[in-house]
């Protein structure tokens, strides 16, 4: 068949077809050609374009036809209407509308809008976005409902110490997301063994402040090591949001440390430091996966500043990286890979300024925050197998290396173990059995550590 397009036709002006006045093709390919041309038109923003063959005639041993194309008007996104959640955060709403305002509308744009709403941990989409075409406007309708991303995990215990005084031990991990309908994120963490260590962390993140792509977050971290020292760290950061799950921060961080015992000749001493910091964060959620909702996390923070102590004043630099990713082999088999790294550069080091690690959120098989280093790097792996919709089992293979210049100690670490997760009506129960070893300490059953947690969502 010979299809006459014409000279300077609309299809040629739009770059959808080559600049030829006639196309020649087998008759059997005509339908595929018409569909492909309409798809090209749709990608260019002509969603309601019409295409047909007219004036069909037979000429000797071939057919002739004219190609008729009606492109209506270029379609652009004029508005995004959110249904199902009247108190959807205004800052998020304004930002996503700004991002797509007057963007050429096609199915790829609709897919991106759907994907951007999937990044919001505080909503679920009840169905795929729909489009309303009028004579002059193009509106996208998004259907959402408020989700339950809040999380609670903890226990508390009471007892007496050797002097008969009351001691409190326990654990609390509380995450509140969008409780005030502004997309905020508040995290509170407290852990005390009633004797040696107490940790308290609190953080608050406010995204899209003043309905702009800017956000702010603040942190307070307090760590007390028995009757030896206490560190109090504060941080404030101003961030720019490229999108909801990708942002950069510029901030200020300071720490004040108190030597409680004041022992002569100790590597522990009072100090204070301050840093100008830069931070990059990327998080990709998989909201339909209750077991593993965080698919990818990239968190890299670096800072340059100064530390003052009773004996010296040093310029310092640090970098801290936390990388995580779930690799889905299929629905039942998942490989989880984490990498935690930290480096502190200084002319000399004080014990109470070192990075502390070990435990369920770090290299497993070691007591919580029982290790310290100015340099630490690790690869933490799990092979996860989903046995049923409500239960999964996993292996634990953790590798680590650290350097502690206050004790001239370099060690390689190995953590081995297994665990399982059980989904109940009230939350997710996790049990982990792990054993840690170093070059000077072989794996022994007596050194094994059991980690138990129960995360309730509300």
Task: Explain the meaning of each model-derived region.
Residues 152-154, 349-350, 389-395, 404-408, ...:
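Extended hydrophobic-aromatic, low-complexity segments
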Residues 106-299, 327-329, 355-360, 369-373, ...:
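Gram-negative/organellar outer-membrane beta-barrel architecture
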Residues 16, 418-437:
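A short, conserved beta-to-alpha structural element at the edge of catalytic cores
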Residues 12, 76-78, 163-165, 229, ...:
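Solvent-exposed, non-transmembrane alpha-helical starts
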Residues 170, 200, 276, 317-319, ...:
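Hydrophobic core residues within well-ordered beta-strands of beta-rich domains
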Residues 1-160, 171-173, 187-196, 201-203, ...:
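Periplasmic polypeptide-binding modules associated with outer-membrane biogenesis and secretion
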Residues 380-382, 413-421:
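Short glycine-rich, acidic/polar surface loops and turns
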Residues 159-164, 277-387, 395-399, 403:
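C-terminal outer-membrane beta-barrel translocator/porin domains of Gram-negative envelope proteins
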């Amino acid at each position: 068949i010979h299809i006459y397009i014409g000279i300077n036709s609309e299809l040629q002006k739009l770059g959808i077809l080559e600049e030829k006045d006639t196309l020649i093709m087998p008759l059997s390919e005509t339908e595929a050609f018409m569909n492909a041309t309409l798809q090209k038109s749709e990608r260019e923003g002509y969603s309601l374009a019409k295409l047909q063959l007219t004036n069909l005639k037979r000429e000797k041993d071939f057919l002739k036809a004219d190609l008729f194309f009606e492109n209506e008007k270029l379609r652009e996104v004029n508005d995004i209407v959110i249904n199902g959640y009247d108190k959807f955060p205004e800052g998020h709403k304004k930002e996503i509308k700004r991002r797509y305002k007057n963007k050429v509308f096609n199915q790829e744009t609709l897919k991106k809008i759907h994907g951007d709403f999937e990044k919001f941990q505080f909503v679920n989409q009840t169905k795929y976005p729909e489009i309303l075409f009028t004579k002059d406007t193009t509106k996208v309708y998004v259907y959402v409902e408020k989700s339950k991303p809040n999380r609670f995990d903890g226990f508390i215990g009471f007892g007496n110490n050797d002097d008969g005084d009351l001691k409190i031990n326990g654990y609390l991990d509380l995450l509140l997301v969008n409780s005030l309908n502004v997309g905020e994120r508040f995290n509170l963490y407290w852990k005390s063994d009633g004797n040696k260590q107490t940790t308290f962390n609190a953080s608050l993140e406010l995204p899209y402040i003043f309905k702009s792509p800017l956000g702010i977050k603040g942190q307070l971290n307090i760590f007390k090591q028995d009757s030896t020292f206490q560190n109090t760290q504060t941080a404030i950061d101003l961030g720019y949001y490229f999108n909801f799950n990708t942002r950069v921060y510029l901030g200020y961080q300071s720490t004040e440390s108190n030597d409680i015992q004041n022992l002569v000749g100790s590597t522990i001493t009072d100090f204070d430091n301050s840093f100008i910091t830069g931070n990059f964060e990327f998080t990709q959620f998989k909201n339909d996966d209750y077991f593993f909702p965080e698919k990818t996390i990239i968190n890299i923070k670096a800072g340059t500043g100064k530390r003052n102590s009773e004996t010296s004043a040093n310029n310092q630099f640090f970098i801290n990286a936390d990388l995580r990713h779930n690799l889905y082999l299929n629905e039942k088999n998942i490989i989880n890979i984490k990498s935690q790294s930290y480096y502190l550069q200084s002319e000399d080091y004080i014990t109470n300024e070192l990075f502390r690690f070990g435990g369920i959120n770090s290299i497993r098989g070691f007591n919580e925050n029982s290790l310290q280093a100015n340099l630490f790097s690790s690869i933490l792996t799990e092979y996860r197998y989903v046995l049923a919709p409500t239960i999964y089992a996993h292996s634990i293979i953790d590798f680590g290396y650290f350097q502690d210049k206050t004790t001239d100690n370099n060690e390689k670490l190995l953590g081995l173990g297994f665990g399982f997760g059980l989904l109940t009506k009230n939350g997710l129960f996790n049990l982990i059995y792990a054993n840690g070893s170093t070059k000077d300490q072989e794996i022994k059953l007596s050194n094994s550590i059991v980690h138990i947690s129960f995360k309730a969502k509300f």
